[in-house]
A protein has these predicted regions:
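Structural signature of tandem-repeat unit edges
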Residues: 1-9, 20-35, 45-61, 71-87, ...
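Short, aromatic/basic amphipathic alpha-helical patches
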Residues: 297-300, 316-329
Length: 334
């Protein structure tokens, strides 16, 4: 209570590694001049009760990894935080694996640039209310919700993603996610979508018809093991800059129809792209050019021999017949 923090400007790593700390009451702290709270409670693995309700965060600009690995923390209320000057929230709550309640009601995020891995591995969270988030300046959302294994529905209709360049692993391992509305997403500046929906095992449908992928270079494992998806229309996808599609639909075991009619494949890695898509009946790849593909190893492994594969011309048909003699239903597009 006699600890005077009125002139402190940085509390970076202040309690880092205090792994035996169970309760911490910092309500009396004067934090009005603090600009940096990054790593402040990093690896406080036993911390169950944290009182920071009196924090004045008007000058705070860095919350990066602030609560990272507070793996015993069950509840966290930041509704009193003024985050109007914060620019980075990278890994702020990452690996808070016991967190059940997270109140971010009044968070102001209009200056935040980096939200990568922000909630990654919050494995006990059932829902996150981020309806008030302003993401108009965010450029990095990589891994943002990855491994949030209990979240069933996620509404991101308020998200402005016009400046985002990285969405890799954004929803990776969201194994309980059933409903995901991304119809408002502007992806025109996104470069990296690798692993974006990897292991979203419960997703039965997803609408990506508004996605602009004209600048994307990496789609590695983008839908890997989306084992409940039955149909996927990606006919709007532009893949002229994509060089890696390896395992993109690997183990989409319920998929029956896949429309990739606008996909081009010049100098791409297609290794294992459709591997274990065991139920697929129609595969529209009418703009694929296999002659320029870098790697096609196991591309059709464990798919039905009579799957209808639509290609653009006889050159592609003959190439497939030569290299995959087990495929019996290759047709040239009308």
């Amino acid at each position: 209570s006699n600890f005077n923090t009125s002139n402190v400007t940085s509390m970076q790593s202040m309690f880092e590694g205090c792994s035996n700390l169970i309760e911490l009451d910092l309500n009396s702290f004067n934090t009005s001049k603090v600009s940096n709270m990054s790593y402040m409670f990093y690896k406080c693995k036993s911390l169950k009760m944290l009182n920071i309700s009196g924090f004045d965060t008007i000058n705070l600009n860095n919350m990066s990894r602030m609560f990272w690995y507070c793996s015993s923390l069950i509840s966290l209320d930041l509704s009193n935080f003024d985050t109007s000057n914060v620019t980075t929230m990278e890994r702020t709550f990452a690996d808070c694996s016991s967190l059940v309640s997270l109140n971010l009601t009044n968070l102001i995020t209009n200056k935040v640039v980096d939200m990568s891995y922000m909630f990654n591995s919050c494995k006990s969270l059932i829902s996150i209310d981020i309806s008030g988030f302003n993401t108009s300046n965010v450029t990095n959302m990589e891994g943002m919700f990855g491994f949030c294994q209990k979240i069933v529905t996620l509404s991101l209709t308020n998200f402005n993603t016009s400046k985002v360049t990285k969405m890799a692993n954004m929803f990776q391992e969201c194994v309980s996610l059933i409903d995901l509305n991304l119809t408002s997403f502007d992806t025109s500046n996104v470069v990296d979508m690798r692993g974006m929906f990897q292991n979203c095992k419960s997703l039965t449908t997803i609408n990506l018809l508004n996605f602009d992928t004209s600048n994307v270079t990496n789609m590695w494992r983008m839908f890997l093991n989306c084992s409940s998806l039955k149909e996927l229309d990606l006919s709007n996808f532009t893949t002229s800059k994509v060089t890696n599609m390896e395992s993109m639909f690997h183990a989409c075991v319920s998929m029956t129809e896949l429309d990739l009619s606008n996909f081009t494949t010049a100098e791409s890695n297609l290794k294992g792209m459709f591997m274990y898509c065991e139920k697929i009946e129609i595969l529209n790849i009418r703009n694929f050019d296999f002659q320029n593909v870098n790697n096609y190893e196991n591309i059709f492994k464990q798919i039905k021999s009579n799957v209808k594969i639509i290609v653009k011309d006889n050159t592609q048909k003959n190439w497939l017949n030569t290299n995959f003699s087990n495929l019996t239903n290759i047709v040239v597009a009308d």
